[in-house]
């Protein structure tokens, strides 16, 4: 009898914990707004991404493109996103022969979102991340580890930029 009541009690407690969320104004980030206005997902599809120099910039632009253009590239975008990147490497672990055994890769992306109609700056912000990788004796392994670290850093930068854009479009009417 006792085990039979456990699922019912669990559901009741879960309902009691989730019930306050209904009144707090919580809404999905990428959902459409309750007033019938466009949500973040619609606005994100109207952002044109400027070319970003160098290979890492190209990869970051492709990651952003994959996330922004769920319904295809806009023909007349309402917003323009410009991104500038900087990166640096710092040796963390030093071997007895004065070579690095571990390296930290820092990447910073400065991005500006402008309204296309009047060139007004809507967002002017930075995204930054740090990843590390091992410097191995085998050169190919080090190159592979560095490339993997770059990929992780670029993915993190794209996630930060996307989240910031979605929050902006989800909370304001530009």
Please describe what each predicted stretch is.
Residues 19-23:
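C-terminal motif of bacterial Sec signal peptides marking the signal peptidase cleavage site
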Residues 33-55:
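Post-signal peptide N-terminal segment of mature Sec-exported envelope proteins
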Residues 25-28:
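Bacterial signal peptide processing site
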Residues 67-72, 115-117, 160-169:
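Sec/Tat-exported extracytoplasmic proteins
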Residues 71-126, 131-148:
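Surface-exposed short loop/turn segments
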Residues 1-13:
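Bacterial N-terminal signal peptides that target proteins for export
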Residues 144-174:
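C-terminal/domain-edge helix-coil "capping" segments
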């Amino acid at each position: 009898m006792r085990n039979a009541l456990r699922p019912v009690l669990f559901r009741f407690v879960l309902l009691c914990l989730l019930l306050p969320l209904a009144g707090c104004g919580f809404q999905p980030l990428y959902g459409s707004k309750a007033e019938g206005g466009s949500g973040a997902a619609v606005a994100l599809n109207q952002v044109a991404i400027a070319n970003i120099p160098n290979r890492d910039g190209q990869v970051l632009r492709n990651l952003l493109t994959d996330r922004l253009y769920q319904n295809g590239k806009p023909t007349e975008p309402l917003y323009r996103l410009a991104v500038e990147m900087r990166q640096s490497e710092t040796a963390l672990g030093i071997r007895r022969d004065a070579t690095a055994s571990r390296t930290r890769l820092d990447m910073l992306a400065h991005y500006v979102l402008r309204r296309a109609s009047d060139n007004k700056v809507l967002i002017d912000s930075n995204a930054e991340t740090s990843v590390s990788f091992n410097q191995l004796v085998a050169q190919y392994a080090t190159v592979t580890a560095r490339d993997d670290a770059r990929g992780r850093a670029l993915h993190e930068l794209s996630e930060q930029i996307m989240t910031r854009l979605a929050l902006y479009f989800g909370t304001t009417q530009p």
